[in-house]
């Protein structure tokens, strides 16, 4: 039986085919209701070990990966870098080689350096999942965003998606652009010129330095925070000025289609890039994104760690072909 996802790792969205993306989204759909059961657990990854190795702060991603592994019955180990040997000077490679000696099945890694998960994948037999690397990619965030959009809109192809804010530092914007354009959606980037990538068009996006034209007729509006921890110069004026010119408020949202949905990968800076009335409004699917994250990460762990040829996502043996 052909594997539904033919890759050993999930290091990025760039390069994945449309059928591979659909396979991941469909697997997440099959697992979505597990989290709504009275017993939120299936035996799919019993006997497997998942190690979460986060070199950057995280709330949603780390928690949802932990929940995803546990709801699949895997043994989940969370390593806090602040209390690990990394603070004593141990290199990423040495950390990974020591973890490999303990025979994990999956390593989930977040790191400030772009390309770090690729480096890890070259030095371990475990499957590697990129949980965000520098300003490069965040593949599971793009998958959960696509999952949320598909549930809300019934499709991805043909949609107009506006991604607004700090694009140049956003791995979320890059992964979403790769995924959405592969699936036939049209992507618009909007932000201050200092926060736009030099070659945004190379990601398949139409680029605007004002938010209003990007919002006009949009089906989906995704807001991004300004990543001040990555700023190294005078990238933007004051917070108040940024909110005035690029914040999503009810008046600006009215430029999008009446049934447009509003998204944000978090963490939100309320009153800066997004008005609380919009974040908590009827068009917001921000908490739906958070819920989708568990199902999507369950699907990724299942596909990479389990014998996907032999078992369904919920742990039942597949019928013989």
Curated annotation (Swiss-Prot):
Protein name, UniProt field: Aspartate carbamoyltransferase catalytic subunit
Function: Catalyzes the condensation of carbamoyl phosphate and aspartate to form carbamoyl aspartate and inorganic phosphate, the committed step in the de novo pyrimidine nucleotide biosynthesis pathway.
Binding site residues for L-aspartate: 88, 171, 225
Subunit composition and interactions: Heterododecamer (2C3:3R2) of six catalytic PyrB chains organized as two trimers (C3), and six regulatory PyrI chains organized as three dimers (R2).
Keyword list, A-Z: Pyrimidine biosynthesis, Transferase
Family: Belongs to the aspartate/ornithine carbamoyltransferase superfamily. ATCase family.
UniProt superkingdom: Bacteria
């Amino acid at each position: 039986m052909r594997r539904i996802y033919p890759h050993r790792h999930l290091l990025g969205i760039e390069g994945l085919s449309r059928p591979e993306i659909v396979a991941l989204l469909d697997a997440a759909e099959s697992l979505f209701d597990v989290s709504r059961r009275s017993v939120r657990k299936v035996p799919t990854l019993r006997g497997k070990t998942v190690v979460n190795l986060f070199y950057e702060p995280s709330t949603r991603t780390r928690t949802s990966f932990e929940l995803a592994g546990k709801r699949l019955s895997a043994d989940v180990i969370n390593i806090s870098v602040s209390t690990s040997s990394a603070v004593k000077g141990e290199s990423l490679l040495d950390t990974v080689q020591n973890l490999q000696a303990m025979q994990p099945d999956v390593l989930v890694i977040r790191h400030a350096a772009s390309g770090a998960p690729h480096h890890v994948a070259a030095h371990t037999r475990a499957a590697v999942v990129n949980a965000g690397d520098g300003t490069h990619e965040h593949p599971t965030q793009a998958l959960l965003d696509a999952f949320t959009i598909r549930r809300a809109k019934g499709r991805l192809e043909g949609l107009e998606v506006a991604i607004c804010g700090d694009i140049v530092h956003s791995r979320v914007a890059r992964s979403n652009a790769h995924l959405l354009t592969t699936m036939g959606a049209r992507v618009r980037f909007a932000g201050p010129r200092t926060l736009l990538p030099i070659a945004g068009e190379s990601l398949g996006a139409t680029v605007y330095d004002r938010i209003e034209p990007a919002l006009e007729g949009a089906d989906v509006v995704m807001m991004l925070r300004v990543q001040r921890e990555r700023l190294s110069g005078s990238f933007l004026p004051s917070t108040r000025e940024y909110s005035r010119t690029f914040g999503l408020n009810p008046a600006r949202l009215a430029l999008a289609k009446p049934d447009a949905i509003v998204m944000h990968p978090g963490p939100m800076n309320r009153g800066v890039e997004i008005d609380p009335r919009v974040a908590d409004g009827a068009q917001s699917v921000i908490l739906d994104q958070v819920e989708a994250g568990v199902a999507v990460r369950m699907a990724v762990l299942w596909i990479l760690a389990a014998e996907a040829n032999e078992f369904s996502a919920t742990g039942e043996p597949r019928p013989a072909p």
